[in-house]
Design a protein with these regions (language model features):
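Short, solvent-exposed beta-strand-terminating loops
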Residues: 175-181
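Short helix/turn-capping signatures at newly exposed starts of structured segments
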Residues: 22-155, 164-165, 173, 184, ...
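Bacterial N-terminal signal peptides that target proteins for export
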Residues: 1-9, 19-21
């Protein structure tokens, strides 16, 4: 188990979790296919299938496919920084309403192979009903008792899926929880008790007053080599 957890921290999380979502710059959009844009549809399929798809966005989706699906006016190309500012990655922001926005991170600047989908809105959920905003109590019902990293550091609140009932999603899905915005001010002792570079059980009583909810989902489609 120790080697497994170490592998998660050094490979999966380092490569996938810690890309900065802040754009370094945005590229101008060109609408070259007005007929295609007119046919664009809203994101009605919001099912997350770890390792396979987020709605219609799959392992083989390209930027041109996104234009056909949603229209160029809903897309903004970005470049995001890698962990600790090392490296950069092409990304495309999909701006929709009703909790359906998301960010596609690409394997290279051709934007023809997605690495992952992240910054998901609350409308996107797995078959188990897990989505952004799911409270810790519900996560425990679906995942069983699991381990997660402490709060307030780079990988804070990341769930170790190999310790849960959803271990089959390991390497395909990254889930990170966070406390309510005022949790530290209201419950500093509880907050500090489950903070830092350490793993804690989801049944630890110090979580209870902190308003823990799922804050981030990353759906891995084509893992980095």
């Amino acid at each position: 188990m120790n080697s497994s957890i170490k592998g998660i921290a050094t490979v999966t999380l380092a490569l996938l979790l810690n890309y900065s979502a802040n754009p370094a710059f945005a590229l101008p959009q060109k609408i070259n296919h007005p007929i295609t844009v007119a046919k664009s549809q809203p994101l009605t399929d919001t099912l997350i299938v770890p390792g396979e798809r987020v709605g219609p966005i799959t392992r083989t989706t390209t930027k041109q496919d996104l234009i056909k699906l949603f229209g160029a006016s809903h897309l903004v190309d970005k470049t995001i920084s890698g962990a600790e500012g090392i490296g950069s990655f092409a990304a495309t922001q999909l701006n929709l309403n009703q909790g359906r926005s998301l960010l596609v991170v690409w394997s290279d600047n051709t934007r023809t192979k997605p690495l992952d989908v992240r910054n998901l809105g609350s409308a996107c959920k797995t078959r188990e009903g897990i989505g952004v905003g799911t409270p810790l109590s519900e996560l425990r019902k679906k995942l069983g008792d699991f381990k997660l990293y402490g709060l307030a550091w780079d990988y804070g609140g990341t769930i170790l899926l190999d310790s849960s009932k959803l271990s089959r999603y390991q390497g395909k899905l990254i889930l990170r929880v966070d406390a309510a915005p005022n949790a530290y001010e209201k419950f500093p002792n509880n907050y500090q008790a489950v903070s830092g570079d350490a793993t804690f059980s989801s049944s630890n009583p110090h979580w209870k007053p902190l308003g823990i909810r799922l804050a981030e989902i990353i759906v891995v489609l084509n893992p980095s080599e």
